[in-house]
């Protein structure tokens, strides 16, 4: 991956590097299933792409200091969709027979992959970089919570 402009925001990076991120997601997801067919992998990728799009949307939402504080205490984002791609993902993982632990591991792997791919392009850690990481973590945590909630109701 080539070096990006040092001012590249994390949400922009996710949008422009979806292919690399999805390859990482696919590699990890394949370790969770034995004998996964190509159709199933394409379904996995579709939901992963939708989750990435929702993460970016969440990260780009303007937030007041009060909204930031409320989110840090577990309140959902005001812009959060009632039925998210992460909800669907949790349901599909339940029907696939994936364990609760494996579901959580997917989001852990997604978080690590995105940050591992993005951070080498950031020569200096600035306040904005840290804020981007916080927003990303909040968005990932909210997506994980959606997946878990749907998984648990089954």
Task: Tell where the protein language model's regions lie, with residue ranges.
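Long, amphipathic alpha-helical coupling/dimerization segments that relay conformational signals between
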Residues: 2-15, 23, 71-154
């Amino acid at each position: 991956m080539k070096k990006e402009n040092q001012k590249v925001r994390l949400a922009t990076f996710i949008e422009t590097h979806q292919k690399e991120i999805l390859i990482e997601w696919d590699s990890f997801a394949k370790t969770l299933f034995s004998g996964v067919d190509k159709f199933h992998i394409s379904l996995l990728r579709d939901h992963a792409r939708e989750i990435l799009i929702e993460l970016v949307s969440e990260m780009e939402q303007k937030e007041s200091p009060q909204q930031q504080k409320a989110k840090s205490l577990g309140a959902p984002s005001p812009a959060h969709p009632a039925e998210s791609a992460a909800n669907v993902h949790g349901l599909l993982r339940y029907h696939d027979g994936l364990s609760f632990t494996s579901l959580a591991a997917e989001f852990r792997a997604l978080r690590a992959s995105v940050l591992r791919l993005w951070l080498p392009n950031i020569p200096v850690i600035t306040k904005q970089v840290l804020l981007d990481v916080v927003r990303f973590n909040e968005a990932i945590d909210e997506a994980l919570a959606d997946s878990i909630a749907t998984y648990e109701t089954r």
